[in-house]
Design a protein with these regions (language model features):
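Acidic, divalent-metal-coordinating active-site segment for phosphoryl/phosphodiester hydrolysis
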Residues: 116-127, 149
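Active-site-facing substrate-recognition patch
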Residues: 1-57
Length: 173
């Protein structure tokens, strides 16, 4: 896990990181909220994230993977940063076209990127889609790990999990 005070400050400056009383999608209460979709629409922050991710990806991957919606800008930016192609993972099966949940390369080794990890549910869903296709996932990278169970949930996959920022980095300083 990388402590990244510069990224933390950028998230605050663009108002993607807010402090106060919030109710999360899970129904849990939190004293902070991270809107990574807001951050990923800022080119400077997106470049910073992709640069940090590029330093953490294994050398031998064939493509980068990210679940729609939040991870797609991150996968695209990392692809542009590294020259490695990317794949988008659909949240559900399509009833038309190919019906595939993957758009892009689907053979070889990949790194999975995501914006925020809370309980690890969406990360596990993405992993399951990739693994069912016979894709080897070599690492999971997230921008923010809220430290609410994602690393524990994902431990059973035996795939390295790393974040740029953890919940302890986000405390109101």
């Amino acid at each position: 896990m990388t402590s990244n005070n510069h990224l933390r400050q950028k998230l605050i400056d663009c108002e993607a990181l807010k402090f106060g009383d919030f109710t999360l999608t899970s129904g849990k209460k939190s004293n902070y909220y991270v809107n990574m979709k807001l951050a990923s629409t800022n080119p400077e922050i997106l470049k910073l994230i992709s640069s940090e991710f590029a330093n953490l990806i294994p050398d031998n991957i064939d493509f980068i993977s990210g679940m729609e919606l939040g991870a797609v800008p991150l996968a695209v930016a990392l692809s542009l940063e590294t020259g490695i192609p990317y794949t988008m993972i659909r949240k559900g099966e399509r009833k038309h076209g190919t019906g595939s949940r993957l758009e892009g390369p689907s053979e070889g080794k990949t790194v999975l990127v995501d914006d925020v990890a809370t309980t690890g549910g969406s990360n596990a869903e993405s992993l399951d889609v990739l693994l069912e296709e016979g894709i080897e996932v070599t690492k999971i990278l997230v921008v923010v790990d809220r430290d609410e169970g994602a690393s524990e949930k994902l431990a059973s996959y035996d795939i390295p999990f790393e974040s740029l920022i953890s919940a302890s980095d986000l405390s109101d300083k």
